[in-house]
Amino acid sequence: MLECWGAVMRRRVKTILIALCLGVSASPERAVAVAIATESRGVAVVRGQDGPPKDPNATRAADLVELVKLDPTIKLDIRYAGANNFLGKPVYKEARAFLQRPAADGLLAAHKELAKAGYGLMIHDGYRPWAITKLFWDMTSGFQREFVADPKTGSKHNRGCAVDLTMYDLGTGQVVEMPGGYDEMSRRSYPDYPGGPPEARAKRDLLRKVMESHGFTVEPNEWWHFNYQDWRLYPILDIAFGEIK
């Protein structure tokens, strides 16, 4: 087992070195993204666009804040820091979640409102480096691409203005049931999906109602994904978590 793991790590280091020779950013997230993509699809996927697009309409400076530092009762289940995601392997080096400050303030207000109904927010993802968005695009095709952003335009996650989340029960600490699972690439993920248990749909709709009352809109095909209203004003970023001040 140790010999196999050593071989995997040697291959990954070699892959990262190749990526650097091709001019790919050396940030931790970018290196991990390149390593995963090249192991699975071949080194050609790292060619072409090698940095986030520039948006001339993004007039606000980035002001990313860490969510758990605002309120420790906000729970984290950062799926991309582990293997429980649609890729089946970690793409983040750290289990952390950030948003632009106004978006974080809106999220905190939603969290406090939900507490009155006995629920809290559990975060699956917030700000996402652009390199990871490119990885997701490179690793998907067909119907799956309905659920990932095109790196040519960047995603609202890259701007620090999108959050993936669910609710947990304040009494039990358990995650509430929803009509579909997080990152599930099926129609059960649609915010208006009519199937599943009525209780699960009611909780999904409660989450949407509260989030939308605090400056967010739900993504049309993902019940868990909410975009902050001023996302257009922020730049597309490719900053590693460890570099956020």
Where are these regions (language model features)?
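Sec/Tat signal peptide C-region and signal peptidase I cleavage site
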Residues: 27-32
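Segments that shape or occlude catalytic/ligand-binding pockets
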Residues: 129
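Short, well-ordered surface patches within globular domains
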Residues: 132
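Bacterial N-terminal signal peptides
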Residues: 14-25
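Extracytoplasmic cell-surface/polysaccharide-interacting catalytic and binding patches
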Residues: 33-126, 139-221, 230-245
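Conserved metal-phosphate-binding beta-hairpin within the catalytic cores
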Residues: 226
